[in-house]
Every structure is written in C-alpha cells, then in structure tokens.
Amino acid sequence: TEKLDYLQDLGIDILWLSPVYKSPFIDQGYDISDYYAIDPLFGTMEDMEELIAEGKKRGISIIMDLVVNHCSSHHEWFQKALADPDGPYADYFYFIESDKEPNNWESYFGGSVWEPVPGTNKYYLHSFHKDQPDLNWQNPVLREEIYKMINWWLDKGIAGFRIDAIINIKKDLEWCSLPSDRDNGLVPVPESLVNAQPIEPFLQELKERTFAKYNAFTVGEVLNETDEELHFFIGKDGVFSSIFDFKQTMLGQEGKGWFDHSLPTADELKESIFQAHERADSIGVQSTIIENHDEPRGVSHYIAEGQVNDTSKKALGTIQILRKGIPFIYQGQEIGMENQVFESVEDFDDIATINGYHVAKEAGLSEEEALAAIAKYSRDNARTPMQWSAEPGLGFSDGSAWLISPKPDVAINVEDQEKDPDSILNYYRQLTALYRHPLYGNTIRFGDMIPAYRERENIIAFERRGDKRLLVISNFQNRQATLELPASIKTVILNNVAGLFQEGDQVLELAPYQTVVLELVE
C-alpha cells in the first residue's frame, strides 16, 4: 500500500497481484491452500482491504490472480478426497483407477501428470506440480464452489482477475496416450488439449455467474488459441475483457527444452507484434508484455547480447507501451532490471528451471552448459525482489528474501533513478503520460496501428492514427540508420537520445537504438 503513490506517478490504472492467497509455496503461490485467506507472508485480510480502498482513492484498481485449473494438495478439498477416495470431494479432482500411469502425458514441470495415491490403485492428475492437483470442472458442485469464491472477492471490491492457465481446464476424458518422439516416451500435456472436450460451456457459465454481474475486468492467460477461439475469448461477447499476446514470448521455443531454444531477432520480434495485431485487431483487445513472472527479463531477452543499455531499454519499452493494446508493466521493468547472475543450480528456486536443468543434462549438456541454458530463460530472473535502492536488502526488506541473486546489479534501482531526469524510470513515466495527453491520448488509447518500414531490417516502426497521425520509429540495432519519412514532422513528442538529426524535412538519421515518437503533418 505504501507504494501506491509510486504506482500512481508511473501512470498505473490497474495493479495485478500475483497470488497472495494462503499457500505452501511449492510454485510461488500458484498452489493455493485457502482461496479465502491472505498468506501471513504478505499480511492480513485487513491489509488487503486497505490496499483496495487506498487504490480506489488514487484511481488504481486491484485485480488478483485467479488460479482455478488446480489448487494445492494442502487444500482441505484434496485432503478430504484423500481421506475418503469414494466420497464427494474425490469428484473435485481427477482420480483414475489403474495399475500403471493412465497415459503418457508429461506435466509442465516434467515427469508424468499422474501421481499414485499411496495405499490404493488410484492415480490423480496434475498438469503442473504433483502438489497442484487439477480441479474437475466436469463437477457442477466444484464449479459452484469456484463461483462463490470469485464473487466473494468481487464483493470485497477487487476489480477483476488475471486468469491463470485457464485453457487447461478442458480435458481429453478418454485419457488417450499420444505418439511421442522423446526418449522418455512422454508427450507435453498441452498436446492433449487438441482432443479435449470444448471449453466454451465452462467459460460462458463462469462469465455469466461471476464476471458479468460485476462488470469485472478480466485478462486471460491463453496460449495457442485458434482464430475461432480468439472470437470466443475477446470478441464482442467474449468471455474475457482481454487476453495476453504471448506470440513474441514464444519465439524460438520450437526445441525440446530451454537448452534448445533461441533468442529472437529484432525482425522476428517485429513480425510477431504485427502478425498478432493483424490477427486480433478486428476481434478484440490484447494485453501486451515484454516480461512477467513466467518469463526472463525482457531487456535481456529481446536486446542483443552486449547491446543492453539505457538507450536500448527505452527503445524496447517504447515499442511495447505504444503499440496497440493494454500494456502491462512488470515490476522492475520500468527501471530496466536485467536477468540475474546465478552461479549454480542451487541458486534457483523455480521448479520449472530446475526441471529445465535436468532436461539439459539428460540431453548431454555439461553442467556449465546446462546452467548457461537455464540462466537465460529462468522464471527466477523476474522473481528476485524489486530493487528500490542500492542498500542491503535492495530497499525491499531488512530480512532475508525468498530468492536473491548472488550478484544483483544494485546500480539499477528506483531511488537513484528518481533523481535522474534521463533515467529509464522517468522515461517510462513520459511514455505512460501519453495515454492521458490532451492532444495524443485518444490516438494512443484507441487509434489504429499501421506497420511502417516493415521490410527494413532491424527497424521496428508503426503509425498510430486517430485524432492525430503519430509515427513511432525504433532503430533496433547497434548501427545508424537513415529513413525517409512519409510526411514532414510537426512535433517531436518523445526521443530516447539527445537530439534528432534531419536532412531536410523528411529524412532522419537515427543513432543505434534511437527511438522517436513523432507527430506528422497530415
């Protein structure tokens, strides 16, 4: 709550909280043991109510993470199911009688999705960790419990939810094994979703029983959606207000593990942005990210190695914030936090990262190579404490943090950037201020986005057209570029370097990673 003024100064309208519910924290709180309680690690319910109230005073709405594909194995529902395998709570989950694992599906965190129930001939399903049993959405009693919980939070005053892993609630109830090309014979669980029953009835009912009653804002975590599903998710009568555009985060992920991934190029980033926009623009609103709690730091991922600096960080931020959509800024993004330095696998906390390390080792990589591979992509890169200052504890806490890099770059912190008018933080404030600008706000919030210089290598540029004609150009490379403008410049709205070199009215010479926001003469 004490940081709400900071968020207000940053131009934030909505604050999304990762899970703060009671949890044993096997998976950073995405294993919820009580949906109605705040974990003592974060405070009390009174603290939560104060945050909601103080946020409203500042025009900041609070949304929570809604994790209803699974709960924690510590949740009373699952404990009651284990205590009475034939009782009503067993039907809250997926228990299968079998003398072996029912199929060859592989969980998101590695290994089989099936865990044996000790002392029985049954297995239960977990698409994620074994301590995150999947909830059985086929059961109307379970669905009623979920709707009751959601409405309880909406009654408390939150504005909506970010909806976690929701595509996974649909299942192939035939539990069919699938062809595998892997040495372990397993198939990643997302591939099973192709044969799953329709998800539409579940989500339509979810919306009608909860979100629609409160005009709640919802943003779905949905990957690999089809064009038809896009209409269902965010069309005129879509079940969600928005979904995240993950197309750019999935670039280079065609391999069999993190060790086999490749970092995206500037042109791949550009095309993913434009293709996602062209696919969704006539349908609904996407939410944009360059990083989140499930991704490495964006500046370390999208900017070429050796070229990460304040100028290139501002360039990347400009592209994300000013492209069409709802921009989400992840904590620390606004000060340019980078991937952390991890010296051994023991430094990591994230279960997906540790699994990625073992997958790399099994593929024949050395310890050093496996560590280098997971360090690039680890979710822990974005899960270290927010760097408020350079002092011990980074201004986050006087105590021991749950996760901290052995060598944090303490030079990147809020306190120092507050004092520097040219800092990344103050540049982000200028970016978000454009959404409220009396001349340009409507164009940026609601205007069309039209790709520009699409064929030019390493140039990421687009027009925003509405009340005004704006042009965003980023020379996303480590060398100069010359561009001929489509019209004369009326106003230089924003520039991430000092000065703008022009030859005549319509020719620009851009420095490496120089990024400008221009109003053009119409």
Protein language model features and the residues they cover:
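Hydrophobic faces of well-ordered beta-strands that scaffold small-molecule active sites
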Residues: 15-17, 62-64, 161, 218-220, ...
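Loop/helix patches that line or flank the sugar-binding groove of alpha-linked glycan CAZymes
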Residues: 182-183, 191, 201-203, 207-210, ...
